[in-house]
Amino acid sequence: MIKSAMAEKLWSKLEKTLVNNGKAFISVTGGGGKTTFLVSFSSYLKSLGYSVLITTSTKLASPFSFDYKVDGIFLSPSIINYWPGKGESVFYGSYNEALGKTTAPPSSMVSLLYDRYDVVIVEADGSRMLPLKIHTQRDPVIWKTTTAIVAVSGLWAYGKPIKQSVFGPEEKSGLVDKSYYEYLIGEPEGMAKGMSPHTDNVFLFNGGDVVEERVRKEMKTLSLPYSSFGFIVSMNKDEIYETL
């Protein structure tokens, strides 16, 4: 049984970890909860009075078909005429009618907008709703303005077939276990891709509330690169179960 009353609050911890002097430009990669991260973390930051810009360097579901819980939506360069207030969130992208999705706006425009928003959160990767991701040469798309990278993965893949759990060019077979997560962390096209010693790096293993305690304890012993943080969490419950 999970003693959630004892668990540390996730969004509070991430605000302290990722936001420095009131500013952060966060790129989110991987699978298993990126969109939940966008919505939940931006909502938490709003509650603290931060102005937040949500965007993508790849593709995102249209804000007209998915509720990002924002106060404003801009799908054109007219956003340059808008100045956000404190505690306000705005969605920005370019709409692709053929795809029915929001695609990446010019990175130069987003860099300019960073001057007027406290926090920018960028969905920098796609995983087609699968919990794990192997990248290609094309992704993730990390813009130069990035100050922090959050690599998300879903723990509900544990014990499931690799072929059914991973989006991307994966040739391995078998079941997902701790050694496979270790492989994903160390693989050049894996979880750590895009991270550097110059960014604040966080690994979020989401779904800590849906796996057994023995799995959480086993995953807690994973080794992470750089001076990064790692947390076994439940985004839906705003809880941290283990710190790596």
Model-derived features: positions:
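N-terminal phosphate/diphosphate-binding loop that engages ATP/GTP or pyrophosphate donors
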Residues: 42-97
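General beta-strand structural signal in soluble alpha/beta enzymes
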Residues: 28, 53-56, 91-94, 120-126, ...
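Charged, amphipathic alpha-helical linker segments immediately N-terminal to NTP-binding catalytic cores
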Residues: 1-5
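Short, basic, glycine/proline-bearing loop/turn elements
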Residues: 24-28, 87-100, 124, 176
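Loop/turn-to-beta-strand initiation segments
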Residues: 86-90, 116-120, 148
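Solvent-exposed alpha-helices and their adjacent loops that cap or buttress functional pockets
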Residues: 17-21, 81-85, 112-114, 140-144, ...
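Conserved catalytic-core segment of NTP-binding enzymes
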Residues: 100-104, 125-225, 234, 243-244
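Walker A (P-loop) phosphate-binding motif
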Residues: 7-48
